[in-house]
């Protein structure tokens, strides 16, 4: 369920505790703690209010939005060398999003990013920055390094990777990378590239970035370029017709019955429908947005795996929660997963997760972005139980979702039938593609940023399941059905009542695991959700209604500005910066109409105006701006 972090899944906490973690994922099973290798969180964020007070920044308004953004980077850090990442775009709100990567001695600094948001008026709106500003090493030092095979072996040994390298050879490519041939144990050929990284102490290290996809983990390992036994940091990309299905909005079998839907796609979001990619029409669970199949052995092959085929396009199969074993309802499981993932794709598209923003599609139809990256949807995946995960590589490479069987009930329960799990997993793809730009899915790798990656998944899953008669007093537990526990898999259920959920910003001071941190973030977003619903009402339909580009109700408005905030925030943001990005997203979308509702929601949970981030001692605040008192 990580998009970019440890290859753990949905369940990482025992049911009623917040401090203890239950490790999961392949590397954890091999005794390797990837949390110890997280990249440092070094980003700053200058919100739109601060920009408005800086005349030097406001004067930058000549040329295209990319030109204006480039001038800002040069003005902010004149001595820096950098490149424009080729994934800039103008979103549906009119903001231009431009991403830069710092370079030193011709090499990328892999965790030194600068993102600039440019307003419709051609002026700087806000920006984030994690560029290195220390002493630049001599270019001659870039020639003093180990060979790439030594680096691959260093990563293999340190992380206990199941990759055999005895016959490995390295071949240089025209992209400045080395591709390894003769290895076994990885899903694709490993690669290595010489890059710098900024370490936790602020110094610079020359490293080999070794990429290995081993299924449960898809790793970028930063191996010291001189000492191959030293791994500085690690990023993990994994985080894990008619259709008879539980309808969208029904979270699990306890909430409703299955129904038959005809042609349920939204053509503006899926112009080829769900069962075509524009080149070929399919009679199975395959199309432009995803390909769903059974994967009982947990292997890496998917194209030739079993999926239901219906020449008359009737994907209607028997299922009830009492059926056992799970293989007796494989067709229904695959169909439900295919339906849920595609429906969410279409909803996110209407909210702004489009081709140019890095969404998951085979064909982008000349709408920008990189294609050939539908989501591989594995139902009843045999590589694990009681969990799920999602791997998010950069734009142009397929995402991968693994859905497991949950064994905490008799008979076992299939995670594909709990929509909240599917939504949570897919949201890792959303947040990783939007934060830092589609080509950089390494921007949710810190404890707080990774925690928010988990929290966004819970937030969207909860927002989608809201019912007509729900109020701000409604309480929802995460994955209660699959886990066979009314309290779900989080330390607390989502509630606006402190007696039910007491979490605040300073709770994070006692937490060291991303799912626990994510529960705090999702709790704050649940407060935001209800503040906006109380102000604007709630649309109980499956998609938003827009007026001048703004959702007319509070539920979809909250989902929209949270999504837009991901586009605006810096790489590896903390809670304070992500809060500011949501405020800025509302200002860009509505002119700041909901400023006080947003501030009040965050301040209730100690993320008010005086909140301060310090990774060891966060300061909470329940203060709001004077105009919101």
Swiss-Prot record:
Query: Which EC number(s) are documented for this chain?
Result: 3.4.24.-
Instruction: Please list the GO terms describing molecular function.
Output: metalloendopeptidase activity; zinc ion binding
Superkingdom assignment: Eukaryota
Instruction: Name the catalytic site residues.
Output: 425
Under the heading PROSITE patterns, the entry gives: ZINC_PROTEASE
Q: Propeptide ranges, please? A: 20-240
Identify the main location.
secreted
Compartmental location? Secreted
Listed cofactors? Zn(2+)
Query: What residue stretch is flagged as signal peptide?
Result: 1-19
Glycosylation sites recorded in the entry for this protein: 281, 331, 469, 617
PANTHER family the record matches: EXTRACELLULAR METALLOPROTEINASE MEP
Identify this protein by name. Answer: Extracellular metalloproteinase 10
Q: Which gene encodes it?
A: MEP10
């Amino acid at each position: 369920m990580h998009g970019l972090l440890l290859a753990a899944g949905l369940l990482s906490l025992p049911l009623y505790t917040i401090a203890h973690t239950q490790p999961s994922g392949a590397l954890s099973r091999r005794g390797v703690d990837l949390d110890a290798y997280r990249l440092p969180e070094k980003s700053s964020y200058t919100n739109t209010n601060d920009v408005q007070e800086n005349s030097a920044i406001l004067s930058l308004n000549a040329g295209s939005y990319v030109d204006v953004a480039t001038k800002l980077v040069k003005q902010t850090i004149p001595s820096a060398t950098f490149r424009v990442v080729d994934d800039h775009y103008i979103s549906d709100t009119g903001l231009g999003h431009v991403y830069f990567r710092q370079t030193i001695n011709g090499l990328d600094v892999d965790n030194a990013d600068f993102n600039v948001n440019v307003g419709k008026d051609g002026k700087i709106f806000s920006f984030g920055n994690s560029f290195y500003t220390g002493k630049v090493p001599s270019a001659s030092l870039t020639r003093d390094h180990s060979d790439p095979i030594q680096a691959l072996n260093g990563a293999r040994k340190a992380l206990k990777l199941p990759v055999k390298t005895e016959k490995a050879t390295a071949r240089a490519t025209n992209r400045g990378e080395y591709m390894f041939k003769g290895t076994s144990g990885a899903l694709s050929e490993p690669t290595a590239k010489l890059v710098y990284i900024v370490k936790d102490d602020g110094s610079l290290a020359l490293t080999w970035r070794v990429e290995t996809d081993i299924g449960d983990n898809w790793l970028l390992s930063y191996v010291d370029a001189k000492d191959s036994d030293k791994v500085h940091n690690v990023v993990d990309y994994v985080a894990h017709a008619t259709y008879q299905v539980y309808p969208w909005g029904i979270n699990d079998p306890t909430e409703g019955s299955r129904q038959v839907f005809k042609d349920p796609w939204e053509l503006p979001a899926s112009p080829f429908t769900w069962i075509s990619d524009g080149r070929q029409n399919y009679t199975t669970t395959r199309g432009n947005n995803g390909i769903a199949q059974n994967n009982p052995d947990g292997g890496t092959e998917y194209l030739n795996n079993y999926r239901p085929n219906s020449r008359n396009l009737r994907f209607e199969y028997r299922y009830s929660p009492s059926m056992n074993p799970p293989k007796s309802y494989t067709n229904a499981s695959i169909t439900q997963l295919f339906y849920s993932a595609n429906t969410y794709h279409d909803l996110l598209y209407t909210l702004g997760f489009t081709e140019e923003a890095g969404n998951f599609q085979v064909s982008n139809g000349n709408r920008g972005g990189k294609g050939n990256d539908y989501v591989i949807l594995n139902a009843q995946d045999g590589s694990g139980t009681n969990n799920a995960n999602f791997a998010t590589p950069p734009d142009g490479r397929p995402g991968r979702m693994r859905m497991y069987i949950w064994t905490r009930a008799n008979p076992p329960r299939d995670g594909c039938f709990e929509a909240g799990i599917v939504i949570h997993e897919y949201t890792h793809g959303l947040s990783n593609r939007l934060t830092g730009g589609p080509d950089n899915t390494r921007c949710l790798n810190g404890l707080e940023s990774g925690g928010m990656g988990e929290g966004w998944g819970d937030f969207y899953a909860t927002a989608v399941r809201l019912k007509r008669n729900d109020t701000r007093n409604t309480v929802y537990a995460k994955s209660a059905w699959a886990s066979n526990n009314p309290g779900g898999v989080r330390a607390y259920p989502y509630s606006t009542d402190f007696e039910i959920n007491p979490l605040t910003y300073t709770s994070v001071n006692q937490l060291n695991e991303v799912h626990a941190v994510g529960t705090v973030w999702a709790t704050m977003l649940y407060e935001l959700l209800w503040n906006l619903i109380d102000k604007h009402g709630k649309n109980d339909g499956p998609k938003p209604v827009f007026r001048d580009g703004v959702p007319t109700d509070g539920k979809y408005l909250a989902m929209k500005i949270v999504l837009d905030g991901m586009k605006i925030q810096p790489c590896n943001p903390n809670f304070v910066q992500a809060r500011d990005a949501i405020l800025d997203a509302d200002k860009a979308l509505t002119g700041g109409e909901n400023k006080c509702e947003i501030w009040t929601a965050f301040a209730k949970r100690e993320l008010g105006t005086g909140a301060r981030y310090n990774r060891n001692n966060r300061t909470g605040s329940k203060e709001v701006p004077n105009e919101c008192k």
